[in-house]
């Protein structure tokens, strides 16, 4: 398709999202991450293996995604997301996928997706659990992430994989559900709000 999807975070959620969207023939993917691949990532980040250790996630992800589908255009953003750089890139994409692991980033992604009226799929995982929210901000009456979480009551330790741990299959399931929500929207199928 000609759809453009921006994936923020090439970790346990972003990897399966990118892989399944690429396999599905998405026209354009943007991937944002500033991190390098570490051994502790391998069990939940399906695009990476031991040969990729210490390399930049976005560069390796682009290479592997191009091997899956060379027709998908992939643009990489190898930096930590902030308000300034996110405002510059969000306008070019139809769909925003939040695969981050901290609420500061999640709220920033939420706020700018709302401001620019984007379709946002946000996901989170911890231990054996995960969830996704699908927000179509083109609809002015749509709630946002802040409606469900009060910023002052949240600790980033809730989403910290190093602190809490994560079962790798949970990341794959939640990331696949995020990809599924994007595909359903592109195909004009009914949306699930979980």
Predicted regions and their residues:
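Adenine nucleotide-associated cytosolic modules
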Residues: 1-192
């Amino acid at each position: 398709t000609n759809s453009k999807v921006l994936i923020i975070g090439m970790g346990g959620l972003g990897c399966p999202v990118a892989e399944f969207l690429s396999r599905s023939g998405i026209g354009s993917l943007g991937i944002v991450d500033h991190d390098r691949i570490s051994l502790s990532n391998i069990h939940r980040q399906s695009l990476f293996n031991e040969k990729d250790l210490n390399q930049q996630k976005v560069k390796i992800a682009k290479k592997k995604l191009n091997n899956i589908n060379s027709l998908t255009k992939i643009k990489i953003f190898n930096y930590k997301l902030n308000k300034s750089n996110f405002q510059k890139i969000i306008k070019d994409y139809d769909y925003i996928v939040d695969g981050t692991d901290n609420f500061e980033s999640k709220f920033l992604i939420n706020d700018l997706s709302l401001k620019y009226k984007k379709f946002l799929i946000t996901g989170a995982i911890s231990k054996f659990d995960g969830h996704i929210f699908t927000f179509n901000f083109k609809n002015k009456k749509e709630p946002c992430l802040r409606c469900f979480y009060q910023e002052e009551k949240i600790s980033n330790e809730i989403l910290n994989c190093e602190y809490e741990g994560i079962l790798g299959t949970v990341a794959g399931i939640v990331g696949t559900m995020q990809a599924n929500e994007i595909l359903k929207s592109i195909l004009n199928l009914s949306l699930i709000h979980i």
